Amino acid sequence: MAFRNDIDSSKFKFPEPTNPNTCIRDIMEENEVSVKYYLSTVYIDTLKKHKARHESKGNGFGYEIRDLDGKAGAIVCGGMGRERNLIIDKRLTNFVPVTHIKGEVNREGIRKMTPREWARLQGFPDDFKLELADTHLYKQFGNSVTVNVIEAIAKEIRKVLENGK
């Protein structure tokens, strides 16, 4: 953290985590989500083959199905990371696709996280309106800095600015 030379920043400290025990289950949608978030059997097969191909070359690419009681992986710019944050959610009752997919909707309950779940991961409140297409929302949240982190750092900066002159 950088401050002007005329400000005593020696008392600045990065905030401690406030809730290190938050897990994926805590940010999941309360109700059954649309079938559009569930992967097709063909796509899952493609991910498995792609991962095996990369592993055979010693590379680290791969999809990952996250434990609901564990932590989410990084969501990064451009909305990448969706395949590294797959979850199993067996609440789906209607397996009829609402978009064009190859194959059938998987019956294992493997799905990508929803934009609302990504918003929650980034600290956005539930009343934050998600009024764009999912693709744009994934990109926005992937490019976002976690709201709670920025808020906590800003409070510490304010303390320094109020007391540092």
Task: Show which residues each predicted segment covers.
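Acidic-aromatic/histidine active-site loop/patch
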Residues: 150
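Short, solvent-exposed loop/turn segments at secondary-structure junctions
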Residues: 5-7, 78-82, 126, 135-136, ...
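Class I S-adenosyl-L-methionine
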Residues: 1-82, 93
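Short, hydrophobic alpha-helical segments
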Residues: 154-165
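Cytochrome P450 core scaffold surrounding the K-helix E-X-X-R motif
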Residues: 84-88
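FAD-binding beta-loop-beta segment adjacent to the flavin cofactor pocket
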Residues: 96-132, 137
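Short linear, low-complexity motifs centered on an aromatic residue
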Residues: 89-97
